[in-house]
Amino acid sequence: MSIFNTKRMQLLGMTISAVLLLNNPLSADTSEAKKPFSEYLQECPWIGLIANQITYGPITISDVNIHDGDKLAFASPGETLNGMLKYKVDSKDLDSLHLYHLVIGIKKEGAQDCITHNLGMWNSKGHGHFSLKAPEKPGIYEVRFLFTEGLTCARAREAWNSGNEKPSAAATIGIIIVE
């Protein structure tokens, strides 16, 4: 049996490509895991489905890699995780001459990195790199993104961290398991 199967699902009329985890998490290294991945999957079965491509508002995120793996990473408390992703911004619904930022962070922990900027006048695409600090408390955490307006990256991160704007579950692009 393979370590993962790709399935196509119909959800509210939209086709999404998802990865179903079976015995191992995608291409993440589980040799250092403190318990079998199947136990994590039993505790939180939702971590078995992570979309390969996510469109959230005017931005599409794809090809997410966290910590030299795929969309799932095991980490020690406080460990720095590096990742990369591809993005595509459709500017047709953005305000012209407004500055927008793609921010990456961890649910309930806050925004941690800013990947790219867009002026709102042109479509853009590319790939970006990011760093995340794993939470200090062991657990299962969602990596999310927010595409928001702000004069600087610091202000865009503050929009998330202050609670004024928070990415929904639809903006989940990865999972970090802190052991």
Cite the ranges covered by each PLM segment.
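Bacterial N-terminal signal peptides that target proteins for export
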Residues: 2-12
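Bacterial N-terminal signal peptides
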Residues: 13-23
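Structural beta-strand segments of beta-rich domains
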Residues: 77-83
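Aromatic/hydrophobic beta-strand junction motif of beta-rich domains
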Residues: 83-91
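Short proline/glycine- and polar residue-rich coil/turn motifs
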Residues: 118-126, 135
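Short beta-strand elements
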Residues: 151-179
